[in-house]
Structure formats: C-alpha cells, structure tokens
UniProtKB/Swiss-Prot annotation:
<feature type="domain" description="HTH merR-type">
    <location>
        <begin position="3"/>
        <end position="72"/>
    </location>
</feature>
<dbReference type="InterPro" id="IPR047057">
    <property type="entry name" value="MerR_fam"/>
</dbReference>
<keyword id="KW-0475">Mercuric resistance</keyword>
<keyword id="KW-0805">Transcription regulation</keyword>
<dbReference type="GO" id="GO:0003677">
    <property type="term" value="F:DNA binding"/>
</dbReference>
<keyword id="KW-0804">Transcription</keyword>
<feature type="DNA-binding region" description="H-T-H motif">
    <location>
        <begin position="6"/>
        <end position="25"/>
    </location>
</feature>
<dbReference type="Pfam" id="PF13411">
    <property type="entry name" value="MerR_1"/>
</dbReference>
<dbReference type="GO" id="GO:0045892">
    <property type="term" value="P:negative regulation of DNA-templated transcription"/>
</dbReference>
<dbReference type="InterPro" id="IPR009061">
    <property type="entry name" value="DNA-bd_dom_put_sf"/>
</dbReference>
<keyword id="KW-0614">Plasmid</keyword>
<dbReference type="GO" id="GO:0046689">
    <property type="term" value="P:response to mercury ion"/>
</dbReference>
<protein>
    <recommendedName>
        <fullName>HTH-type transcriptional regulator MerD</fullName>
    </recommendedName>
</protein>
<dbReference type="InterPro" id="IPR011797">
    <property type="entry name" value="MerD"/>
</dbReference>
<keyword id="KW-0238">DNA-binding</keyword>
<dbReference type="GO" id="GO:0003700">
    <property type="term" value="F:DNA-binding transcription factor activity"/>
</dbReference>
<dbReference type="InterPro" id="IPR000551">
    <property type="entry name" value="MerR-type_HTH_dom"/>
</dbReference>
Amino acid sequence: MSAYTVSRLALDAGVSVHIVRDYLLRGLLRPVACTTGGYGLFDDTALQRLRFVRAAFEAGIGLDALARLCRALDAADGDGASAQLAVLRQLVERRREALASLEMQLAAMPTEPAQHAESLP
C-alpha cells in the first residue's frame, strides 16, 4: 500500500492542497490512518477517489451530489450508493444533451461579422 500525505495526494492527483483539504472538510475524502503528529495518511483508493471527484466536478457535477455518493460508499450502503450513482448518471446525461445543443448552436453561428449597420438609414 502506498501512503500519501495531503501534499503528496494533491501532487499525484494534479490538484492543490487547498482542494484536498476542502474535500476532506466536505467528507469527500477520508484518511485511512494518522501519523503520531496527527497528519492524515491516504492510500491508493483515496487517490482514485480524488481523481474521480475532481473529474466529476470539472464535468459540472456539484460537490453536494458527490458528497452524497461518497457518504453512501463510506457507509457501505449499497442501495444508497446505487441510488446516488443513478442520480449522477442522470446529471451526466443532461450535461451531454446540453453540450450537444450548444454544439449545434455553435455550428449554426455565422463566422462573418454582421452587416446590420449598413442596412440602417
């Protein structure tokens, strides 16, 4: 097992230490052990979760929804985790639809400057 400090976890996930600490406060991450000095230690599973949470957040999934999923996973609540995963899948599908609509709108946008001023008296 690899043991990560907050700073090493942040570095390996490509995020700031502040993000890791924020996720800890929100319950998105939990240390698996503590040093004698009281510092949290994390394992590879925590690194995977951090990468997942960050990717989901970057994709537009809110931290509250992600926290509900993480709480269900941490509580070994299979039904709760399944329900939260279903919610996340719905959010992802809505994002896909919104992005597809935006893509169509972008494709329809004119690339030349508008000639409105010339037609005014």
